[in-house]
Amino acid sequence: MNFVGIIAEYDPFHSGHALQLRMLRQRGASTIAVCMSTGVVQRGGVPILPEAVRVRAALAAGADLVVALPAPYANASAEQFAAAGVHLLAALGCDTLAFGAETPEPAPLQAAAAALCSAAFPAALRSQLESGLPFAAARAAAAETLCPGAADLLQTPNNILGIEYCKAILRQGAAMQLLPLPRLGAAHGTAQTGQVQGQALASASHIRQLVHTQGIKAASPFVPQAAMELYRQAAEQGQLADPEKFSTAVLTLLRTKTPEQLSTLRGAGEGLENRLYAAAREAETVNNLYDRLKTKRYPTARLRRLVLDAVLDVPAAGLPALPPYLLVLGAKRSALPLLKHAKIPAGTSLAGLVGQDPKLQIAADMHSKAVDFSLLCRYKIQPMGLAYTAHVVLL
């Protein structure tokens, strides 16, 4: 293990993330690269803090290099999110992929991934769906018929994402070893807190809730001191995400769309565009919109991502299947020479990358549009164009 990659959101970066970086150093990682969601996040929202703040927090805690997981690929299913992250880290030259998991052993996760990628899986899934099971339950049941034990693995969020990483490595033929790490402290997506090595830990979702309800100081017990100082400064400058601005922006933009426009979106079809059109015309808040969209057929997470795709006009066709460039958001200067060995266009300026290769324009513009939208949803609204003008963070 020499060059370790992590796929993360850091929404926000907290003490559990810092502990993970320390664990990787203790296990022998000489260089750690992070592929981080930018503009938007996988749950169909905007990050609580802008990219530069999260990048600085990660570098201060021990990361060597932070590259962008561009917005269209960040707001995506677990499968697409994982595929994009693996592709970028493999292109960067990482030899190991580290991630948190409830089952921190590679073999069971790899076996489940192999079952999901097998030629027999589509028929097994179809059989379970025909029995009336919802998609997630049908998927787990189908996997269980091909790989005993897979259903249990597919019940927990970090294992699910870990299996998607394994699938991506298999399908892409990426030369990366797996390093699943035990998830320590608080469970994903809960209000529980924990303590490891004397450090209080909480999930990112709980920290976000604390900040939204009690202010930035409420995050202090759960984030490194250096990060906390960055977060205080960001809050003073109005850079925190404002849920009310997000809600208003989403509804405003959705109400300008026609059903025909919505039908061309990624993830639309099967009447979802009509359901979204009707819900947007009646909803009073974005949460009310999500409630109106709810259906047994579609997971809430998918509907949230569809809403954001509609806001950003992410098309069903035309976007490259995988990110076509490596955009460095921040780095220690000693890590920059690694870019010379990248297998896809790489650099520290989005404008520079597009200037070198115009074929990158579509993905770059989609990424820029999402960053612009995110800046609209801050307590202090920021100017447009930051994705193309931002300076790389160097330490």
Predicted regions, residues:
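Active-site cores that bind ATP or allylic diphosphates and position pyrophosphate for catalysis
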Residues: 68-395
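N-terminal catalytic cores of NTP/NDP-binding nucleotidyl/phosphoryl-transfer enzymes
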Residues: 1-54
